[in-house]
């Protein structure tokens, strides 16, 4: 399978490897961000999915353009389908997660905690009697800490964020306002295409002037939970998961076979990986309304990326 599992390019400076993306900091304040095909879930790398990095980059590109009127973003240019060059930012130490439904499979999701009997979480109280995947009265922000690689994200409340000095009051007011407006735009656009944007996460940073800027990715199948709207009511009534366009497909496959936070992860079969690749492509098409045509130039994905980044060497 044609995948990009690693994207180390020794000619580029300032290398940093994240869970999914590999970054290079240029001397002039720009950052080159390469989206690999690695699939991260449960705070680990599960496998690599063909064309995933290209799909994530192009989906985020669509959404950055669709939301540029709401808040500034880090994008400067796209020299390759897997690559964005952006303004280097100081990333704020809080991930801003917005949820419109009682859903999720991770340890920090409100559904997981709700099933354990918790009602007080993230500085809010949820009512009794909610069903799995039920729509909330209004979208809520459920922030988490940004764990170092290998660590686990931890739930935070607004009060804890301010008390710990992770964000100032002004920063919190700005990112929470941006996040809710971005989510509303995402839900509206998704609904036009027969999709439900159930939840998503945003990452913000500050530039050299202290301006808060949207970074990383936005409304991609990795950072978001998308459901097919036509499947929702029946799934809610039957207590099953709505048909989805996101990495919940593999997360659910893994979670059905082990406790991913404690047990060894079973090998994910090739047919599951290939199905996941098709789901990512279908997600791109459903979200953007455009056909996904992968760029197959170059002997390998990394060869193509290298040739497109030569001017940065």
From Swiss-Prot:
Its EC number is 6.3.2.6. The keyword Amino-acid biosynthesis does not apply. GO terms for molecular function: ATP binding; phosphoribosylaminoimidazolesuccinocarboxamide synthase activity. Pathway: Purine metabolism; IMP biosynthesis via de novo pathway; 5-amino-1-(5-phospho-D-ribosyl)imidazole-4-carboxamide from 5-amino-1-(5-phospho-D-ribosyl)imidazole-4-carboxylate: step 1/2. Disulfide bonds: none annotated. Belongs to the SAICAR synthetase family. It is an enzyme of class 6 (ligase). InterPro entries: SAICAR_synt/ADE2_N, SAICAR_synthetase_CS. This is Putative phosphoribosylaminoimidazole-succinocarboxamide synthase 2. It comes from the Bacteria. One of its GO terms (biological process) is 'de novo' IMP biosynthetic process. It catalyses: 5-amino-1-(5-phospho-D-ribosyl)imidazole-4-carboxylate + L-aspartate + ATP = (2S)-2-[5-amino-1-(5-phospho-beta-D-ribosyl)imidazole-4-carboxamido]succinate + ADP + phosphate + 2 H(+). The gene is purC2. It comes from Mesorhizobium japonicum (strain LMG 29417 / CECT 9101 / MAFF 303099) (Mesorhizobium loti (strain MAFF 303099)). SUPFAM superfamilies: SAICAR synthase-like. It holds the Pfam family SAICAR_synt. Keywords: ATP-binding, Ligase, Nucleotide-binding, Purine biosynthesis. PANTHER family: PHOSPHORIBOSYLAMINOIMIDAZOLE-SUCCINOCARBOXAMIDE SYNTHASE. The keyword Nucleotide-binding applies. GO terms for cellular component: cytoplasm.
């Amino acid at each position: 399978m044609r995948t990009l599992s690693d994207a180390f390019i020794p000619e580029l400076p300032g290398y940093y490897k994240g869970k999914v993306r590999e970054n290079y900091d240029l001397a002039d304040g720009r950052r080159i961000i390469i989206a690999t095909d690695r699939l991260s879930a449960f705070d680990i790398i599960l496998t690599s999915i063909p064309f995933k990095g290209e799909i994530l980059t192009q989906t985020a590109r669509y959404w950055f353009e669709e939301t540029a009127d709401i808040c500034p973003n880090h994008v400067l240019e796209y020299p390759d389908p897997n690559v964005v060059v952006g303004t280097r930012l100081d990333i704020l130490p809080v991930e801003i997660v917005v949820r419109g439904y009682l859903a999720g499979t991770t340890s920090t999701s409100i559904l997981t905690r709700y099933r354990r009997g918790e009602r007080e979480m993230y500085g809010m109280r949820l009512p009794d009697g909610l069903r799995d995947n039920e729509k909330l009265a209004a979208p809520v922000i459920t922030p988490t800490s940004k764990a170092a690689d290998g660590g686990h994200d931890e739930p935070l409340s607004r009060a804890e964020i301010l008390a710990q000095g992770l964000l100032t009051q002004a920063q919190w007011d700005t990112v929470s306002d941006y996040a809710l407006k971005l989510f509303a735009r995402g839900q509206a656009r998704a609904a036009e295409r027969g999709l439900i944007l159930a939840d998503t996460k945003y990452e913000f940073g500050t530039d050299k002037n202290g301006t808060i800027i949207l970074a990383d990715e936005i409304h991609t199948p990795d950072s978001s939970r998308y459901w097919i709207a036509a499947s929702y009511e029946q799934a809610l009534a039957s207590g099953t998961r709505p048909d989805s366009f996101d990495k919940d497909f593999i997360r659910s496959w893994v979670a059905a076979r082990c406790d991913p936070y404690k047990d060894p992860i079973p090998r994910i079969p090739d047919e599951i990986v290939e199905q996941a690749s098709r789901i990512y492509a279908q997600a791109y098409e459903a979200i953007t309304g455009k056909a996904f045509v992968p760029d197959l130039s170059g002997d390998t994905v990394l060869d193509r990326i290298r040739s497109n980044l030569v001017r940065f060497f």
